[in-house]
Regions:
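Non-catalytic carbohydrate-binding regions of carbohydrate-active enzymes
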Residues: 3-63
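Terminal, non-catalytic domain-edge segments
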Residues: 11, 43-104
Length: 104
Protein backbone atom coordinates (compact mmCIF):
# COMPACT_ATOMS: atom_id res chain seq x y z
CA UNK A 1 0.00 0.00 0.00
CA UNK A 2 2.86 2.39 0.66
CA UNK A 3 4.08 1.80 -2.90
CA UNK A 4 0.65 2.86 -4.17
CA UNK A 5 0.81 5.99 -2.02
CA UNK A 6 4.27 6.76 -3.36
CA UNK A 7 3.51 6.13 -7.03
CA UNK A 8 -0.03 7.51 -7.31
CA UNK A 9 0.07 10.54 -5.01
CA UNK A 10 0.13 14.00 -6.53
CA UNK A 11 0.42 17.42 -4.95
CA UNK A 12 -3.34 17.79 -5.34
CA UNK A 13 -4.16 14.27 -4.12
CA UNK A 14 -1.70 13.14 -1.45
CA UNK A 15 -2.61 9.60 -0.44
CA UNK A 16 -0.11 9.76 2.42
CA UNK A 17 -2.33 12.36 4.08
CA UNK A 18 -5.63 10.58 3.43
CA UNK A 19 -7.60 9.47 6.49
CA UNK A 20 -11.05 8.00 6.80
CA UNK A 21 -13.63 9.75 8.97
CA UNK A 22 -12.58 7.55 11.91
CA UNK A 23 -8.87 8.39 11.49
CA UNK A 24 -7.61 5.33 9.61
CA UNK A 25 -4.91 5.86 7.02
CA UNK A 26 -1.53 4.64 5.85
CA UNK A 27 0.26 6.56 8.61
CA UNK A 28 -1.50 4.44 11.24
CA UNK A 29 -0.67 1.25 9.35
CA UNK A 30 3.04 2.05 9.31
CA UNK A 31 3.01 3.18 12.95
CA UNK A 32 1.37 -0.15 13.85
CA UNK A 33 3.83 -2.26 11.86
CA UNK A 34 7.07 -0.41 12.64
CA UNK A 35 7.62 -1.89 16.12
CA UNK A 36 7.05 -5.39 14.75
CA UNK A 37 9.46 -4.85 11.87
CA UNK A 38 11.99 -3.59 14.42
CA UNK A 39 11.47 -6.65 16.64
CA UNK A 40 9.17 -9.37 15.34
CA UNK A 41 9.03 -10.94 18.80
CA UNK A 42 6.46 -8.21 19.46
CA UNK A 43 4.02 -9.86 17.05
CA UNK A 44 1.22 -11.02 19.32
CA UNK A 45 -0.54 -13.33 16.86
CA UNK A 46 0.49 -16.73 15.58
CA UNK A 47 2.98 -16.21 12.73
CA UNK A 48 0.94 -16.42 9.55
CA UNK A 49 3.65 -16.75 6.94
CA UNK A 50 5.63 -19.83 6.04
CA UNK A 51 8.97 -18.03 6.09
CA UNK A 52 8.49 -16.03 9.28
CA UNK A 53 12.12 -16.57 10.29
CA UNK A 54 13.41 -14.97 7.07
CA UNK A 55 11.56 -11.68 7.68
CA UNK A 56 11.95 -8.79 7.96
CA UNK A 57 13.93 -7.61 4.97
CA UNK A 58 14.43 -4.07 3.68
CA UNK A 59 10.77 -3.15 3.41
CA UNK A 60 10.29 -0.36 0.85
CA UNK A 61 7.46 0.88 3.06
CA UNK A 62 10.07 2.12 5.52
CA UNK A 63 11.76 4.35 2.92
CA UNK A 64 8.50 5.64 1.48
CA UNK A 65 6.90 6.34 4.86
CA UNK A 66 10.13 7.66 6.34
CA UNK A 67 10.34 10.30 3.64
CA UNK A 68 6.60 11.04 3.51
CA UNK A 69 6.29 11.51 7.28
CA UNK A 70 9.83 12.79 8.02
CA UNK A 71 10.53 9.83 10.29
CA UNK A 72 14.29 9.25 10.45
CA UNK A 73 13.83 6.10 12.53
CA UNK A 74 12.04 4.43 9.60
CA UNK A 75 14.96 5.21 7.30
CA UNK A 76 17.49 4.04 9.89
CA UNK A 77 15.59 0.76 10.31
CA UNK A 78 15.46 0.29 6.54
CA UNK A 79 19.24 0.66 6.30
CA UNK A 80 19.74 -1.95 9.03
CA UNK A 81 17.71 -4.70 7.34
CA UNK A 82 18.76 -7.38 4.85
CA UNK A 83 18.79 -5.85 1.36
CA UNK A 84 19.50 -9.09 -0.47
CA UNK A 85 17.42 -11.99 0.86
CA UNK A 86 18.28 -15.42 -0.49
CA UNK A 87 15.02 -17.27 0.14
CA UNK A 88 13.04 -17.55 -3.10
CA UNK A 89 9.64 -17.01 -1.46
CA UNK A 90 10.87 -13.89 0.34
CA UNK A 91 12.30 -12.54 -2.93
CA UNK A 92 8.95 -13.17 -4.64
CA UNK A 93 7.20 -11.08 -1.98
CA UNK A 94 9.80 -8.31 -2.20
CA UNK A 95 8.96 -6.69 -5.56
CA UNK A 96 10.47 -3.23 -5.02
CA UNK A 97 14.12 -3.77 -4.19
CA UNK A 98 15.36 -0.29 -5.09
CA UNK A 99 12.74 1.99 -3.51
CA UNK A 100 14.98 5.05 -3.57
CA UNK A 101 14.54 5.11 -7.37
CA UNK A 102 10.80 5.59 -6.82
CA UNK A 103 11.38 8.71 -4.73
CA UNK A 104 13.11 10.79 -7.41
Amino acid sequence: MTAVCQIVSTRADNLWAFETSDGRGIRKVVEYMFPVIADKRGWFLTPDVQYFDQWPVRQPSLVFAGLAFSRAEYLKMWLSLNADPGTEEVIRNFPIRQPVLWTL
